[in-house]
Amino acid sequence: MNPTFFVVLHSAALACAHTIFQRVYVDGVGEGHLSGIRIPESNWPIMDLSSNDIICNGGVNPYHEPVSLAIIQVPAGSTITAEWHPTIDDVNTTESIRPDHKGPVIAYLAKVPDALQTDVAGLSWFKFYEDGLSDDGSWATDRLIANAGKVNFTIPSCIQPGAYLLRHEIIAVHKAQTYPGAQFYMECAQLNITGPGSVVPSPTATFPGAYGSTDPGITVDIERLINYTVPGMPAEG
């Protein structure tokens, strides 16, 4: 085989294995492709838990320009559908992530002064959704694949209204026997949450820092797994 062709083929296969969060639906109504999300050009994972890139991506994976200035209007208590695909060309509408990339799917929110602010360091994130390994041996990523790259979760109905960032994440742990091995795919969407709520959720955590390299959900051999602990704090809905 021609070496150049092999490299191109190998790179294409790796790219198809990876994934990007690229569309939001609010109660079933689509917000538009790439709208309201900070989208990287590359679908490569973040693997360094100490890097600020673990917050909203970017950095080593520069954002697709122009970065969306849309703010997604979300009533508290509504259902969000997040859609994942390997590329951002809006052509692939069924593939999401390669089936061997097993792992959890997670969602966090952080209240911010401005949903368009570029400084995301030091934000207080609370987890409100997680899906990991089910009793039947299927993973959250299996369910994502079966649903053509879509996952649904409910925005808490009681939280304070205002500007938020939604940090949506897939952690692929198929090669996580040692650190760095787990692959972190995340993007942040810009939300304005409306409603009469007044609750300030807790506990919260900051990124970097929410995950440790020796956490049981980060360094794990899924071939010898009996049960799985989703990384981070418990999800509070």
From Swiss-Prot:
Enzyme Commission no: 1.14.99.56
Required cofactor names: Cu(2+)
Cell location: Secreted
Enzyme class: oxidoreductase
Signal peptide (UniProt feature, chain positions): 1-17
GO terms, molecular function: metal ion binding; monooxygenase activity
Keywords: Carbohydrate metabolism, Cellulose degradation, Copper, Disulfide bond, Glycoprotein, Metal-binding, Monooxygenase, Oxidoreductase, Polysaccharide degradation, Secreted, Signal
GO cellular component, as recorded: extracellular region
A Pfam family recorded for this sequence: AA9
Binding site for O2: H174, Q183
Biotechnology: Lignocellulose is the most abundant polymeric composite on Earth and is a recalcitrant but promising renewable substrate for industrial biotechnology applications. Together with cellobiose dehydrogenases (CDHs) an enzymatic system capable of oxidative cellulose cleavage is formed, which increases the efficiency of cellulases and put LPMOs at focus of biofuel research.
Keyword Flavoprotein belongs to the record: no
InterPro entries: AA9 (IPR049892), AA9_LPMO (IPR005103)
Catalytic reaction list: [(1->4)-beta-D-glucosyl]n+m + reduced acceptor + O2 = 4-dehydro-beta-D-glucosyl-[(1->4)-beta-D-glucosyl]n-1 + [(1->4)-beta-D-glucosyl]m + acceptor + H2O
Chain sites annotated for binding Cu(2+): H18, H101, Y185
GO BP annotation list: cellulose catabolic process
Residues carrying sugar: N92, N152, N192, N227
Disulfide bridge positions per record: C56-C188
Family membership noted in the UniProt record: Belongs to the polysaccharide monooxygenase AA9 family.
PANTHER family the record matches: ENDO-BETA-1,4-GLUCANASE D, PUTATIVE (AFU_ORTHOLOGUE AFUA_1G12560)-RELATED
Task performed by this protein: Lytic polysaccharide monooxygenase (LPMO) that depolymerizes crystalline and amorphous polysaccharides via the oxidation of scissile alpha- or beta-(1-4)-glycosidic bonds, yielding C1 or C4 oxidation products. Catalysis by LPMOs requires the reduction of the active-site copper from Cu(II) to Cu(I) by a reducing agent and H(2)O(2) or O(2) as a cosubstrate.
Name of the protein in its database record: AA9 family lytic polysaccharide monooxygenase C
